[in-house]
């Protein structure tokens, strides 16, 4: 396995670790509605950071974006909006299925759809089947899916042992939302594929290969921001128990406390895709679809590890922890299989 591929896998791991940890600061926010908290964090992660970093990277910010036709920018934006819809469905999936089943189904579907649809759309899926390296990477995707399933099973055992139940368990509604979440969340993978002309243009301007994907985030995350912020602002305006004015009428120290924590959560959320871009840059072009598989499987892996570190599994008993550990090992094996396949 080459050093470039190894570093690509490593940066995807770092990005996934940030994704697994990003909600921790949000949990410390006090006396704010989820909608206000999510909006503040989202403004930082989807608007401020993408724009600021792109302004630093590009020699001429406005000239870069105005150089693209609407036919180039629109698919990137719409796939970003698609991914934003997946974000909203993710929370509803947890509500009706519970954390473990919801995450397992949603992540499993988005891993498959986001990973395999890209080479199918690009018309080179047959190359993957007909080459040794391609077959090896596909095997890695299958093993990763098995690993996600094992971790999901561990979560179910933990919830059963600790008496944790879904907020409003509804299997039929939850499954529909989980499938929708999985499909729509793959929009980020499709957006990255559609944004290749933007990456190439950034490279032509002399942007370092590690950073060429970052300017496209202005458009991708702009699509996601409109969906997420629109959802939050509509709820803040229409739901009687929610009030943006009330949330910002608290004592000044508490407002500052909440804003800083929400901004930190937004920063950590953005960093997952900052390092995703670094990892994506190190993956061989013919296997760039594997970036999504690495990100999502490492997200599940890091989520399990973070749960152990935060002692969330302390009262779950030995069996759930053993199953979780097995699932984490399987995901690590999957990453190595994919790495070997890409090296071939």
From Swiss-Prot:
User: Its topology with respect to the membrane?
Assistant: Multi-pass membrane protein
- Record GO cellular component, one term: plasma membrane
Q: What is catalysed by this protein?
A: L-rhamnopyranose(in) + H(+)(in) = L-rhamnopyranose(out) + H(+)(out)
Listed A to Z, the keywords are: Cell inner membrane, Cell membrane, Membrane, Sugar transport, Symport, Transmembrane, Transmembrane helix, Transport
Compartments, as annotated in UniProt: Cell inner membrane
Q: Which GO terms describe its molecular function?
A: rhamnose transmembrane transporter activity; symporter activity
A Pfam family for this UniProt protein? RhaT
Q: Which spans are transmembrane here? A: 4-24, 38-58, 68-88, 101-121, 137-157, 175-195, 214-234, 259-279, 290-310, 323-343
Could you confirm whether the keyword Ribonucleoprotein appears in this record?
Answer: no
Question: Is Cell membrane found in the keyword set?
Answer: yes
Biological role stated in the UniProt entry: Uptake of L-rhamnose across the cytoplasmic membrane with the concomitant transport of protons into the cell (symport system).
Give the UniProt family note: Belongs to the L-rhamnose transporter (TC 2.A.7.6) family.
Task: List, alphabetically, the NCBIfam families matched.
Answer: PRK13499.1-1, PRK13499.1-3, RhaT
What protein name does the entry list? Answer: L-rhamnose-proton symporter
Q: Which gene encodes it?
A: rhaT
